[in-house]
Amino acid sequence: MRRREFMAGVAASLAALRERAEAMTASTRPNIKWCVSSFLWTSTQWPDKGTLPYTEMLDVIRDTGFNGYRFTGWPGILDRIGMDLSQLERELSKRNIQIATLSFGGPADDPSKHAEIEKAAREASQFLKRFRATELVTFSPRRPNKVLVREHLRRACEFYNRLGDVCAEYGIRTGMHNHSQGQLVETQDEIEMLLKWTDPEKFHWCPDTVHLYMANCDIIGLFQKYADRLIFFDLVDAKYEYQKEELRLANGQVEKAGSQNGTFMLGNRDYGDGEIDLQGIMRILKNVKYRGWINIDHHYARVSPRHSFD
């Protein structure tokens, strides 16, 4: 499939996803903004090297009606987008879209790395402030053996309170993005420990529903209990599907049958086709009067995405 055809397919898929998602919210909810993650491009469409067709992605985001996107690959990808920050500002302004946040992380469970992570957080916060974003999505480090998770999480939480203070100096809030593929904060008990051990005034919650699903969490229960900690989240429907066959991606990469990454990607479903109570989540948001971004972080676009929406 040629790149132009693939981009058209992705655009059709994203537009339909946005329409389905917006249908779950009342038209009178101006406090919610919708974004998409650039991870869809960086993970499955673009090669690992060379200058990226970045403005093509921006066009798709504009044409499909999103308000903005989550910037992924920071800071290394800045050298590959084919423009400086001033030009990026112009390209965003021309399309009337925003950078909603960026993905951030580091070995927060290693005290010897804290100064380095803090420096990176200051740079990330400066970047976000320049683009008038107000949230930083933090990913946890790689997970150790389960026996050691509690201690590593304790160390990380001590740092995350400090990280919240650092970001606040720039008018930025930060919070945890749970991840089900080998990171420190995956399961329900780990999420709840993190939210218990961090200061709610300093460190918040940026969950991802597909990762909550893959970790077998009580998604509705978590949203009910911690809705007041939400500052940003990824809304993705999901249904488990083991990858039985080789999966060839648009960027030429191949996921061998039985891979965890391929199985995870196949588990991403169009809204209403999975097993997550999306309406229940939206009711909770309404009850707490949630204000902020909802990210449609569809991690995988199938070869013919249009067929599932017609």
How does the language model describe each region?
Residues 70, 101, 137, 175, ...:
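Conserved beta-strand positions in the central sheet of alpha/beta enzyme cores
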Residues 57, 88, 124, 163, ...:
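Aromatic/hydrophobic pocket-lining residues that form π-stacking "cages" and hydrophobic walls in ligand
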Residues 53, 84, 116, 120, ...:
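Soluble or luminal CAZymes and related metallo-dependent hydrolases
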Residues 39-41, 72-76, 104-107, 141-143, ...:
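Active-site beta-loop-alpha junctions enriched in small/polar residues
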Residues 2-65, 187-310:
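Histidine-acidic metal/acid-base catalytic patches
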Residues 39-52, 107-117, 149-151:
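Active-site mouth loops of central-metabolism enzymes
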Residues 10-17, 28, 91-94, 98, ...:
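Active-site acidic/histidine proton-transfer and metal-coordination neighborhood
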Residues 70-89, 143:
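Glycine-rich, proline-tolerant flexible connector loops at the mouths of alpha/beta enzymes
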